[in-house]
Design a protein with these regions (language model features):
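Conserved substrate/cofactor phosphate-moiety recognition/catalytic segment
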Residues: 14-57
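Hydrophobic anchor at the beta1->P-loop junction of P-loop NTPases
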Residues: 1
Length: 180
């Protein structure tokens, strides 16, 4: 999963995981901000990239038969490093990691901006992140398929349909809630 702030990545990740017996890999950057009460410095970006990758590997090892949904992919750490700090030093490593993904879902910013606690950049930054992602596409597509998620409704269904077309169906209907 890639995309700027407030592009529906977490909602989509949770929805996909719920319908595929999947596991969501949470964001190391968010944990860093929660733990430190600030955004990272340029020299901390590499350790965040490695922490995100570690989370992905742990999820794959702990759940070898599950669909692993990365919210976001390690790639986003490198993209943010380039966007915030004009530092492209993480790009090659991020591309190597992207080659391990079956696909990347690119959540586009065509949904309303909803501020979350700890976010401070706003919709204009989200657009800048989306533009930078578009500049990474040729390299990303060499590593793995990139599937674009758009629209204000039905993103989970769109993602499922795109993934079905790419890999075949792994989806199930969510179990009804019991009232017992």
């Amino acid at each position: 999963m890639i995309g700027g702030e407030s592009t529906g990545k977490t909602t989509l990740a949770l929805g996909l995981a719920a319908t595929s017996h999947g596991v969501v890999v949470s964001e190391a950057l968010r944990a860093f901000v929660d733990d430190h009460g600030r955004t990272p410095l340029p020299e901390e970006q590499h350790s965040i990239l490695l922490a995100q990758r570690s989370r992905e590997i742990a999820a794959s090892q702990d759940h070898p038969h599950a669909t692993i949904v990365c919210d976001p992919a390690t790639t986003m750490t490198a993209i943010y490093s380039e966007l915030y700090f004009n530092d492209s030093s993480l790009r090659m490593q991020a591309m190597e990691y992207a080659a391990d993904y079956d696909a990347i879902l690119w959540c586009r910013p065509d949904i309303p901006w909803v501020a979350e606690p700890g976010q401070h950049d706003g919709p204009q930054f989200r657009e800048a992140a989306d533009l930078l992602i578009s500049q990474w596409l040729d390299d990303l597509r060499v590593a793995t398929p990139v599937l674009e998620i758009t629209g204000t409704q039905g993103r989970i269904l769109m993602a499922r349909d795109l993934l079905d077309a790419q890999f075949g169906s792994v989806w199930q209907q969510p179990a009804p809630h019991s009232s017992t």
